[in-house]
Regions:
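A general secondary-structure signal for short beta-strands and their flanking turns/coil
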Residues: 2-4, 17, 46, 486, ...
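Solvent-exposed, membrane-proximal periplasmic/extracellular interface segments of envelope transport
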Residues: 63-78, 645, 744, 749-762
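Generic structural signal for residues in well-ordered beta-strands
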Residues: 163, 237, 337, 454-456, ...
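Solvent-exposed beta-strand sheet faces enriched in polar/charged residues
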Residues: 166, 240, 366, 492, ...
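Arginine-glycine-biased low-complexity disordered regions
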Residues: 710-720, 740-767, 791
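Accessory, non-ATPase domains that flank or precede helicase/AAA+ motor cores in DNA-metabolism machines
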Residues: 1-364, 371-404, 408-420, 434-446, ...
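A carboxyl-terminal module marker
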Residues: 726, 730-750, 775, 788, ...
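Inter-lobe coupling/hinge segments of SF2-like helicase ATPases
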Residues: 257-263, 267, 279-718, 756-757, ...
Length: 798
C-alpha cells in the first residue's frame, strides 16, 4: 500500500490550478495531514515549490504511478488550514475568478507566506537526554541549525508534546520572549555578601520574600544591572526565556466593564438574533441611527453565543478599528478576544492568528480578512458598517467579506448580522424583499442624546468674503463659540496632503506623475510632490518646468493646508490633524485619539477616518469642509457614498448630554444626497436613489461585472479589449448589456494603460464559465504581460 498526497502548488496560473499527486516518503507517513504546507519538486527542472496538502489517498501499487515524485520537506507539523477553510476556498473560486492557491494564501497571516525559519522549543516533557540529542542541549534552537537526523525526529517530538514549533521571519523576530527569574533560596541564604555592598544586601532581602517567579525587567527597575548580574552569576537566580504574546500588554491596559442595560428595541433585536444561533437561516439587517447602541447589541449577542459554547467573528472597517472600538470588546471578553487588522506587525498578526487556531480566542474582531479566522463552531458573524466599500478586496483574490460571511454562516448554522446607520442600497433592497430579516433601532441609546441639527452652507454665498478658502464665516463663528464654551470640534475633509495640484498661472502647466495620468499632490511636511497611485515623489517646483515662470500656484485643498489655515485663523485653538500621513507610524492613530479624548486638543481635523466609530462626549460641533469631493466622482455610487459619509460624520456630534450641531459646506446645496443627509432621512434617500438605479439599470436591479485589461502598449490593450468584447457578445445572451471598452477614468498608472468593460445582467447561466474562459485566454503565450482583472460586483468604477 502506497500513500499519496494531493497538493496545490504555489503557481497561480491556469495550467497549474489543479491538485498534483506526490508520494509521501516513509519517514513522513503518520506525520502529514490535510491543511499542511510542504515543499515539492515541480516541473522538468524539479524546482522546489511550496504547496498545500488538500487530500490524502492510498494506492495499491506504486508501479501504476512510476512518475510520482516524493514530497521533499514538511513545512508544518500541524495543519495551518482546516477543512472548513479548504471547503470555503472551493466555494469562493466560483465567484472571485481567482486561482485556488491565491485564495488559500489569503487565509493565512502574511508571515507564513514570507521567508522564515522555524524555532523548536522544548516543553517540560522533554528530558535532558533528548534535549542534548535533538536540541543541542538548549531550550530552543533554530530548525536551520539542526542536522538532517535531528530534523527528521522533530515531527515525532511535536506529536508527543515534547517540543513546540514556532515561526521566525528572516527579517524580523517572530517570537517575542522575555526573561523570567526564579529564586534558588538555598543558594541565596548561604551567599556571602559584604556588609558594605548595601544594594546587594537589599536585593537579597527582597528576593528572600519572593515566593513566585518574576520578570527580570521588573528587577532592573529596582536594582542596577550589575547587582542583578551578581545574583545570576552566583546561581541564586535561574533565568528562563518565556514566550509572550505581543498583544498581552495591550490587553492588560483595558479595564473590565459590565454589560449595559438594553432599551426595548435593543433587547428585541438581541432576542430575535439569538433564536437563530445554530439554526442558520436568513441574515439580519440591523439598521440603527448613529448612537443607537448597535455595538451594545453585538456585545450581548456575543455573550449569548459564548454561553452556548460557540465562537464569534466581528468585522469592522479598517478605518473604524480604533482603540475605542476594540477596547469595548476586550473590556467585556478579555483574552478571549483576538484582534486582527493591518496596523499590527507581521509578528503580532501571527500571534493573534495562533491564539485563534489554538482555541484560546473565541471572539475575533478585525478588518476584512478576519472573516477567514480559523475558528471552529461559529455561532455568530457580525459585519458592522456593512455599507463600507473596504469590505471588498481590490487585489487578487477579489472577494467581498459579506459574501464569504454568507458562506461561513451557512456552513456553521451561524446567525449573520449586517449592521449600519446607512445600509448599502443593495442590502436594504434585500431586506425590503424579505431576503434578509429587518430590525431597526430608531432612537439613540442615551435618552438625553438628541439627533444633531444639520445646517448646509453654500460656498457660493461667500465667494470673495471668506477669511480662508476652506472656512466660511458661519463655520468659523460656530467653531469660536465652541472654543469659548470649552467644547470640542471635529472637522472632516476628504483629502489628505496640502493641495490637490500645482499649476503655472502663466502657461497652465500642471505637474503630473510621469507614470500615471494623474496630477501630483503637494505634501508640505516632506516638501515633496507625491503620486498616491505609484508612490512617485519629486521636489516641489518653484519654477514652471514648461515656461520657467515663477507664477506657481497651489489649487484645491487638503488636510495639511486646512490645518495651516486653521492655526492662522484661530491661534489659540489646539488642533490635531489626523490623516494617512500623520498616522503612518505604529500607534500614532491611538495616541492622537487618546490626546483628543483626554481634552488635550480642541479641534480634531481629519479625513474619512474620523467619521467612523469615534465617541467623544464633549464634541458638540462637526464641520464638513467640502461635501463635494466624493460627489463628483464618475461612479454611480457617488451619491450613496456622499450621503453615507455625511450621515456618519454628523453622528459624531452630540452623543452625550450636550446638544450637537453639524455644518456642511458645499457648492451643491440642492443635490439630493446633501438634502437627505441634512434631514438625516435614510428612508427618503433610499426611495429616491432606488428610482435612479431602476432607470439606469444599476444594482440592485442588475448585477455588474467589471473587466479591466492593462498593458504598457496602449494600442495592444485596445485591440485585446475589443477581442474580449467580441468573445463575450458571442457567448453570452442578448439580455446582457455591455458598456465599453473605454479607458478607465485614470487611464494610466504604473506605466500601464487600463481599459475596462462593464457587464450588466439579471440572470445569465453561461456567465461564470465564459468569464473563466476569458481569464484562461490571457494566459496564452501571445498575451504575455497582458493583465486581466475580473471583478464581480465592483465597488469602485474610478
Amino acid at each position: 500500500m502506497v500513500l499519496v498526497a494531493q497538493i496545490i502548488v504555489d503557481v497561480p496560473l491556469m495550467q497549474t490550478d489543479r491538485p498534483y499527486s506526490y508520494l509521501i516518503p516513509e519517514a513522513m507517513q503518520g506525520q502529514i495531514a490535510i491543511g499542511m504546507r510542504v515543499h515539492v519538486p515541480f516541473g522538468k527542472g524539479n524546482r522546489l515549490l511550496q504547496g498545500f496538502v488538500i487530500g490524502l489517498e492510498e494506492q495499491e501499487n506504486l508501479r501504476d504511478f512510476p512518475e510520482l515524485k516524493p514530497i521533499a520537506e514538511l513545512l508544518d507539523y500541524e495543519p495551518v488550514l482546516n477543512q472548513d477553510q479548504l471547503d470555503l476556498a472551493d466555494q469562493m473560486r466560483h465567484t472571485v475568478f481567482s486561482y485556488k492557491i491565491s485564495i488559500l494564501k489569503s487565509m493565512l497571516p502574511g508571515l507564513l507566506n514570507s521567508q522564515y525559519d522555524k524555532v523548536i522549543m522544548a516543553t517540560d516533557k522533554l528530558d535532558e537526554e533528548d534535549k542534548q540529542t535533538f536540541l543541542q542541549g538548549q531550550d530552543h534552537v533554530l530548525f536551520s541549525q539542526l542536522s538532517e537526523e535531528q530534523r527528521q525526529a522533530i515531527p515525532r517530538l511535536v506529536q508527543s508534546g515534547r517540543v513546540t514549533v514556532d515561526y521566525l521571519a528572516k527579517d524580523k523576530q517572530n517570537i517575542k520572549t522575555e526573561k523570567h527569574y526564579s529564586v534558588q533560596k538555598g543558594i541565596l541564604e548561604t551567599l556571602a555578601i559584604s556588609q558594605r555592598a548595601k544594594r546587594r544586601l537589599e536585593m537579597r532581602d527582597f528576593l528572600l520574600k519572593k515566593s513566585e517567579p518574576g520578570k527580570v525587567a521588573d528587577l532592573h527597575k529596582l536594582f542596577s544591572r550589575d547587582v542583578v548580574k551578581f545574583f545570576i552569576e552566583a546561581g541564586a537566580l535561574v533565568i528562563t526565556e518565556v514566550e509572550v504574546n505581543r498583544a498581552d500588554s495591550y490587553f492588560e491596559k483595558v479595564e473590565k466593564t459590565d454589560f449595559l442595560e438594553l432599551n426595548v428595541q435593543q433587547a428585541h433585536a438581541v432576542e430575535e438574533m439569538t433564536r437563530q444561533i445554530g439554526q442558520g437561516g436568513k441574515p439580519f439587517l440591523l439598521e440603527g441611527v448613529t448612537g443607537s447602541g448597535k455595538t451594545e447589541v453585538y456585545l450581548h449577542l456575543i455573550e449569548r453565543t459564548l454561553a452556548m459554547g460557540k465562537t464569534a467573528i466581528v468585522l469592522v472597517p479598517e478605518i473604524s478599528l480604533t482603540p475605542q472600538m476594540t477596547n469595548r470588546f476586550i473590556s467585556r471578553f478579555g483574552d478571549l478576544v483576538a484582534i486582527m487588522h493591518s496596523g499590527l506587525s507581521d509578528g503580532e498578526k501571527f500571534d493573534e492568528w495562533r491564539k485563534v487556531r489554538s482555541g484560546q480566542a473565541k471572539v475575533v474582531v478585525g478588518a476584512r480578512s478576519a472573516i477567514f479566522a480559523p475558528l471552529d463552531n461559529i455561532g455568530a458573524i457580525i459585519i458592522d458598517e456593512e455599507h463600507e466599500a473596504t469590505y471588498k478586496q481590490e487585489s487578487n483574490p477579489r472577494y467581498h467579506a459579506r459574501d464569504v460571511a454568507l458562506l461561513r454562516a451557512k456552513s456553521h448554522g451561524a446567525v449573520l448580522v449586517l449592521g449600519s446607520a446607512t445600509p448599502s442600497i443593495e442590502t436594504r433592497a434585500r431586506a425590503q424583499k424579505g431576503v434578509y430579516h429587518f430590525l431597526e433601532l430608531t432612537r439613540r441609546a442615551n435618552p438625553n442624546a438628541k439627533i444633531p441639527q444639520v445646517e448646509v452652507v453654500d460656498f457660493k454665498d461667500f465667494v470673495g468674503r471668506q477669511e480662508a478658502s476652506d472656512f466660511t464665516p458661519p463655520l468659523l463663528e460656530k467653531i469660536r463659540e465652541r472654543l469659548a464654551r470649552k467644547e470640542q470640534v471635529v472637522l472632516m475633509l476628504n483629502r489628505r496632503g496640502y493641495s490637490s495640484f500645482v499649476m503655472c498661472r502663466d502657461c497652465g502647466y500642471v505637474d503630473d506623475c510621469p507614470n500615471c495620468d494623474i496630477s501630483l499632490t503637494l505634501h508640505m511636511d516632506t516638501k515633496t510632490m507625491n503620486c498616491h497611485y505609484c508612490d512617485f515623489q519629486k521636489a516641489i517646483p518653484h519654477v514652471c518646468p514648461n515656461c520657467q515662470s515663477r507664477q506657481i500656484r497651489y489649487y484645491g485643498t487638503g488636510t495639511q493646508k486646512a490645518y495651516d489655515q486653521l492655526t492662522e485663523l484661530l491661534p489659540e485653538a489646539r488642533v490635531i490633524r489626523m490623516d494617512v500621513d500623520t498616522t503612518r507610524k505604529k500607534g500614532a492613530h491611538e495616541k492622537l485619539l487618546e490626546a483628543f479624548g483626554s481634552g488635550k486638543a480642541d479641534i480634531l481635523l481629519g479625513t474619512q477616518m474620523i467619521a467612523k466609530g469615534l465617541d467623544f462626549p464633549n464634541v458638540t460641533l462637526v464641520g464638513v469642509l467640502n461635501a463635494d469631493t466624493s460627489l463628483n466622482l464618475p461612479d454611480f455610487r457617488s451619491a450613496e457614498r456622499t450621503f453615507q459619509l455625511l450621515t456618519q460624520v454628523a453622528g459624531r456630534a452630540g452623543r452625550a448630554d450636550k446638544e450637537g450641531e453639524v455644518i456642511i459646506q458645499t457648492y451643491n446645496p440642492s443635490h439630493y444626497a446633501i438634502r437627505f443627509a441634512q434631514q438625516q432621512d435614510y428612508e427618503g434617500f433610499y426611495v429616491y436613489e432606488m428610482g435612479i438605479r431602476r432607470q439606469l439599470a444599476y444594482p440592485p436591479y442588475f448585477y455588474t461585472v467589471g473587466i479591466t485589461l492593462s498593458h504598457k502598449d496602449e494600442e495592444f490593450v485596445v485591440r485585446k479589449s475589443y477581442e474580449v468584447m467580441a468573445y463575450l457578445r458571442e457567448h453570452l445572451s442578448d439580455k446582457v448589456t455591455f458598456l465599453g471598452p473605454t479607458p478607465k477614468p485614470i487611464a494610466r498608472t504604473h506605466n500601464l494603460y487600463h481599459y475596462q468593460i462593464i457587464i450588466k445582467y439579471r440572470f445569465e447561466d453561461n456567465l461564470e464559465e465564459t468569464l473563466n474562459r476569458v481569464l484562461d485566454m490571457t494566459q496564452e503565450p501571445e498575451n504575455k504581460d497582458l493583465r486581466l482583472i475580473i471583478d464581480h460586483e465592483p465597488q469602485n468604477f474610478t
